[in-house]
Amino acid sequence: MSGQPTAVDCLESSGSTVEDVQETPASREKSYGLPVRKGENSLESPAEQAAKDVEIEELTHSEAIAATGSTRKQCPYGGKAPDEPGKLADESEDRKGENTKAIASSPVLVAVDSDSSVELIESPVKFSSANESEKDPPKPDAVNEAAAKEAEEMTDSSISSPTSESFPEKDEKTNKENEQEPPGMEVDQDVEESISRPAEEYKIENTLKGHKRISLTEIEEHKIVDKKDDVLEVELEKGTAPKAAEDEKLNALLSDGDVFYDKECVNCNCTKLHKQYVLANMATLNFYQVLRKSSKQQFLCMGCHDTAMDLYEEYAGQLMAKQPLLLKDFHQDHADFVALDSSDEEEEEKQPEKSDFSKNKLQLIEDELDDAIKNVLNKVDFTAQLSWSKTILQAKADHLERQFALADVELEKVQTTADKMHCALYNSCPVAHKHLPTLDIEPSDYVHEVPPPGEIVRPPIQLGETYYAVKNKAIASWVSIKVIEFTESTAINGNTMKSYKIRYLNTPYQMIKTVTAKHIAYFEPPPVRLTIGTRVIAYFDGTTLSRGKDKGVVQSAFYPGIIAEPLKQANRYRYLIFYDDGYTQYVPHRDVRLVCQASEKVWEDVHAASRDFIQKYVEKYSVDRPMVQCTRGQSMTTESNGTWLYARVIDIDCSLVLMQFEGDKNHTEWIYRGSLRLGPVFRETQNNMNSSSAQQLRVPRRTEPFIRYTKEMESSSKVNQQMRAFARKSSASAQNNALAAASSAATPAGGRTNAGGVSTSNSASAVRHLNNSTIYVDDENRPKGHVVYFTAKRNLPPKMYKCHECSPNCLFKIVHRLDSYSPLAKPLLSGWERLVMRQKTKKSVVYKGPCGKSLRSLAEVHRYLRATENVLNVDNFDFTPDLKCLAEYSIDPSIVKDTDISKGQEKMAIPLVNYYDNTLPPPCTYAKQRIPTEGVHLNLDEEFLLCCDCEDDCSDKSKCACWQLTVAGVRYCNPKKPIEEIGYQYKRLHEHVPTGIYECNSRCKCKKNCLNRVVQFSLEMKLQVFKTSNRGWGLRCVNDIPKGAFICIYAGHLLTETMANEGGQDAGDEYFADLDYIEVAEQLKEGYESEVDHSDPDAEEDNGGPDAEDDDDFRPNYHYQRKIKRSSRSGSTQNSSTQSSELDSQERAVINFNPNADLDETVRENSVRRLFGKDEAPYIMDAKTTGNLGRYFNHSCSPNLFVQNVFVDTHDLRFPWVAFFSAAHIRSGTELTWNYNYEVGVVPGKVLYCQCGAPNCRLRLL
């Protein structure tokens, strides 16, 4: 041993080598806040230190014995009591005497080892030893003698740790620990170097090592006992009784004398290598972070018990040795876990009875506790511990700060290098910048010199001035002229009119003509804005007109017409011009010229082909101006040259729509959106004026145009009408795309005359407004609900996935009922997990089954459910990323007026809430299904049902007989539609099927939850009836609803047409719904067949061409066009000159604003309904007095639900089920609405305004 002391840091886990230091221990301890010894080495004399250390040693042994609960005889150094008590006791006394003698000669007793715990504190129940136990230990006597001799040779009173020279085995172990240390231990090494002890202290520690070798010999004896324990366990498993001697040894081995078998260790990370268990005390429970239960016993295996006690011994030894605790790195690895306790166990736990103490006793107890705590803290010098901890933490913080500063410098260097690389990369290909001259582009839509409003003044015509005048015919283009003379002429009625002799300008030869002031227009634009009905000529841009592939474009020129729309912001300050020949176009003010004279009734000056339409337009512009609402890509029937053709919307410009006709002609044309040439507008006019023809319902297409009305149209009811007396919702409502803001709702259902013979008076009665619901203006102050996002606390997380074949064993056993939860929440409460993955801007959903298998589509989920025989169904899953499965709309329970309006008839309760007043809905008997009344013969015989025999949950639509019924109906009108997109797609209906859906029925051999059974199940969605602010009662969803999900059916009384008319007069018709499936399907077929073009290709080629020369024929007919064709082929027609001038006739084919063909809307003679009887008419579903929750759905022009006809219990086409499906993802708390498909004007004397507030609102329902 060297003469100079060596400094060894106290950090146990660092294991760093010893370095020679020249500093004194006092200076180092003072620099790090440790207590400074007085004098040379210590604060106390050697004798006082020895006596105090003996006390610490005895106290430590007694605490260890008390903690383990051992009743065995203990040797002073943790060894086991031998079988011969006397002999070993004498040896122990000798060792104790020798050790005490050695301690008395030295002021230090305790030494802290760097790899285990305090040497003086050995666990009496320790069954495993260190590496030294594997070697042959020396004899106890020899060890004691060597330790005593070594203790006598100690001359220095300071404490020192062993060096690598004196303990080569320990140094080798320390080096191994250094290799396994993480990089973060450098901080502890820095702190270790700052706190050390003199090297001479290791002598006492050497002496104590001798005692540890004695204990190692005794641990070998414990191993023999362990082997006997193993034999004992084998015998217990075989059912034999253990031997008495072995039982006594086992009981003597245990700390508390009680050993248990077949128990469960409370340590969740237990390796389960031991089969012996002991009762867990509070110290071990706290170590493993387990709550104590008073109602049941808790056990620890012997290995976990020893581990906990060893760590507590290390804590106590470090504290009693007055060493900084923060220099000791205690590893305690515990994984986070959650203990699932049943509610029954919690109820069984009884609260311990509290004993009553008097105030004096309580005060005495508190004083005694305070004194005891203070004594313990003073004994371990707790104040010094706090000071040391502060110093160590500050040193670590300073070290981390220095490390962070170095990291910032390195990061800056790396960033600088990266910037240089970036610059070098992009400098290799320099970009040449070139400054171009400024380019000023004047916006084409910019408003130029919009004149102010004012009175229209027509100055008198002046001689010698330039004007515009008619050329040859009234509808031809007008050209520039000069007035040369005033003349007078006599009109047909005998009145004298002023005429003007004019000369045409820019002509190859002089041409003079006499015209009236009605055929002359001013040369300059008018100085004021023009109003509706003003007679003008306007410049027509011929480039916007296309009349076929082989036809030329009409030349641009001034043509006569009237002002249809004034300048306003909505049309970008342009005039809408209705030209005399039927064309329409928007024209700016600078291209409009005022006609010098016009009749008081301006339509008298208009060409006869457009006179009637313009007269009605001018008279009703401010009252009734219906126009078709459509979007790009939609199709509608449009009249072209006497034929109704399907045309597609190409573009929309305010009140004009650009239509492209299908067929060989394939021409485009701008048409006014209120023109009767458009099918929807023509039908509306027919409904209002033609009372003799029966009217069919509209074709329910998802993107079909509809008519929008204004609120100023009450006066239009003066027209004589004969219409039905009651309003009815159509069960075949058209579908909207609720997600598209520009999408339009379907057109209203067409009206029908009353089959029951009820007719209305020709004179319209007084208008009665039906908007009588109370409107609450202080809606913001009312208590509102809010959406709450729950989490599945009781859910068992999925297992780690291992490759296996899925079976029913993959599922968790669910003990709680799931009936009261929403369909999408059931998997998350049954051991499933729903993960939303994000990849850049794209999201995707992955379900993890209870066995850990990942499922990424509904097809995979369906296969998994079949393999595991799960009670869940495929409609309990959805892969929409934005959908919240556990979101729920919560309200104040105090405003709930009825907890369940179905009175238990539905599986899911339907509450009723009202936070406006205390009113309740009108009384209604709840009915889950339809109820036939007198005269309704509902045939429910199962023998008339077609059935299937599928065994694959009807997943193969090509083999299922029920699916084939649905597929056949769809492919009748759309043969190329893929079979995967027809009908339900894993119990989701994404679009309306006009021809109906046929579900599997009671005769089918498939399972009750097959993929073709949706509507026949009862309500599963959580819905809520509530009072709206302006529309009466409504229905909203409590949870999120995915797109295509089934909501409910519409149930009520089934009525005949006659009963509906009679009941409508008495009780009202607001809950009527037509079962009009047959009419819808038949008209869909008619619309499909009407797309076929049966006209002559030769006639179509020249219809409306610019070479038409007969101005007297304003309605070109088929015979005339054929005649023109023949004469053209024979060469009898005159070729036009190649050089055009203003003199050339620029006449266009006349286009009539009114159609030249009637749109057949009469009842088909071969209708399927006629097969059921001569007077057979659609049946009516009435939910006025009896019905289900479907009666509470309000109307919306942009609904989130659509209606689907489904055949379940009968295949009779007259009696489909009316089912509601979601048209889009509906968030919780949203009101559910559908399109009533009322038609405006079909009920005389009734006006109902729409208050849905949708962007495409029709404004009126009736």
UniProtKB/Swiss-Prot annotation:
Residues annotated to bind Zn(2+) 1: C948, C950, C954, C960
Residue numbers spanned by region Disordered: 1-194, 743-764, 1086-1148
Chain intervals with Acidic residues compositional bias: 1098-1113
Residues binding Zn(2+) 3: C954, C1000, C1006, C1010
Biased composition (Basic and acidic residues): 26-41, 50-61, 81-99, 167-179, 1086-1097
Disulphide bridges: none
UniProtKB keywords: Chromatin regulator, Chromosome, Coiled coil, Developmental protein, Differentiation, Metal-binding, Methyltransferase, Nucleus, Oogenesis, Phosphoprotein, Repeat, Repressor, S-adenosyl-L-methionine, Transcription, Transcription regulation, Transferase, Zinc
Domain Pre-SET: 946-1018
Binding site for Zn(2+) 2: C948, C962, C1000, C1004
Domain spans labelled Post-SET: 1246-1262
SMART domains (alphabetical): MBD (SM00391), PreSET (SM00468), SET (SM00317)
Function per UniProt: Histone methyltransferase that specifically trimethylates 'Lys-10' of histone H3 (H3K9me3) in ovary. H3K9me3 represents a specific tag for epigenetic transcriptional repression by recruiting Su(var)205/HP1 to methylated histones. Plays a central role during oogenesis.
Protein name: Histone-lysine N-methyltransferase eggless
Gene responsible for this protein: egg
